[in-house]
A protein has these predicted regions:
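Nucleotide-activated donor-binding/catalytic signature segment of Leloir-type glycosyltransferases, i.e.
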Residues: 34-46
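Conserved PLP-binding catalytic core of the aspartate aminotransferase-like
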Residues: 110-111, 120-154, 169
């Protein structure tokens, strides 16, 4: 509701761009797409960006899209390259949209893994920030660079520690390896 109010209350000359790359991972019912504002015909420029890189697992194909009103879409059409997405990317993305059962499965597995990893990190006295995505931001009770280095020694790569660590969730067996190493590091 807060985000929606900010969009509605902004001046008409301000273009709002919302990146909903991770929205498909969200399980919190209070989080929702701003697409409804475009459907309602909001009288302010709004662009919603989506990607096939996250829940669809198609990062290598570099496929995404924007949803906006007809006036903004016309501006995009005049300034974009007609060949900015490969044929394979287009066909694969189109096919992926038809398999919502797979998207639902990925979302459910991600939520289970996110909850499991979060609980373990908290049990190891890490400060864990609530997440609705496929990654977890945490601060270990020891130097984050040490955590990063110890994980790297065992071929587990996480986001570079700039005050905190960021671990992307993977397949359950990859997450188990991360948990096992974290227990060794912090025990």
């Amino acid at each position: 509701v807060g985000s929606e109010m900010c969009i509605r209350d902004r001046p008409k000359h301000v273009i709002t761009v919302i990146d909903e790359a991770y929205l498909e991972f969200v399980t919190d019912e209070n989080c929702y797409s701003m697409l409804k504002l475009i459907k309602e015909g909001i009288d302010k420029p709004l662009v919603i960006m989506k990607t096939f890189s996250k829940i669809y697992g198609m990062a290598g194909l570099r496929v995404g899209y924007a949803i906006t009103d007809p006036v903004m879409a016309d501006h995009f059409g005049k300034s974009s390259n007609a060949w900015n997405v490969s044929f394979i990317g287009q066909k694969t993305a189109a096919a992926a949209t038809l398999d919502q059962e797979h998207v639902s499965m990925v979302k459910n597995i991600n939520a289970q893994e996110r909850d499991k990893v979060t609980k373990v990190l908290r049990s190891l006295n890490c400060k864990v920030y609530d997440s609705q995505t496929n990654f977890i931001l945490f601060k270990a009770p020891i130097d984050n660079m040490k955590v990063y280095a110890k994980l790297e020694e065992q071929d587990v790569l996480i986001g570079a520690p700039i005050g905190m660590n960021r671990v992307s969730l993977g397949k359950p067996e990859m997450n188990e390896k991360f948990i096992k190493i974290m227990k060794e590091i912090l025990s």
